[in-house]
């Protein structure tokens, strides 16, 4: 019975820690991904507006061609926000409307070889599904986090006796994995970027030879990854600090339960 309690307590603590890790990661992604200040800074840094305007040469829709060719910084920012809303299932169509007209800004043209085409619509549909899966995972993680946190507060004795260090060990393992990914990206970002896309997306439909999408977001990734990593680490440090304070509180002579 005692052994079973220990195993269950450790399992729940591992689930608590993993859910905290995933939630921290989701927050770390969402903060810069929905930040207009971040996008404005990146667009100005990389000269994104002029690069996007130049893609009007590939657009057949006359209204869309004119819109892109004369695009303003605010319109570029609005298009970026629309793309993010699409990925988060807040928009049904990747392309936008202006004055009641649908503008076919994003293309779906298969090239020979495949990566010389522009399968923006197909790829972003896949990205949307990936975001959707991520949101579902985070909702589950939030439920697990709250549930295990409540159980930990209720069953402090079992936590104290069996798994005071489990949070730190589990987070250490998670951080080790994160560190390997981070170091790989720092050494060869193109390799890490390609590997990520080959794991989560089929074929080469994510490789664009031209188009608004790749010119709008292509150079942002090198800027967003360090921000995500920094926010993620800060949130994990807060988690570790919270666990350490909780351990200190329940380990005090006044609160510590007697050992069996």
Locations of regions flagged by a protein language model:
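Hydrophobic, well-structured mid-protein blocks that either form specific transmembrane helices
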Residues: 118-157
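Short, aromatic-rich amphipathic segments at membrane interfaces
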Residues: 113-134, 211-224
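Hydrophobic secretory-pathway targeting helix
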Residues: 1-39
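Terminal transmembrane helical module of multi-pass membrane proteins
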Residues: 204-255
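Long, solvent-exposed extracytoplasmic domains/loops
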Residues: 39-127
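Membrane-helix exit/juxtamembrane interface segments
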Residues: 27-59, 185-195
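Juxtamembrane interface at the cytosolic side of transmembrane helices
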Residues: 2-15, 141-191, 238-260
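Juxtamembrane non-transmembrane "cap" segments at the membrane-aqueous interface
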Residues: 186-210
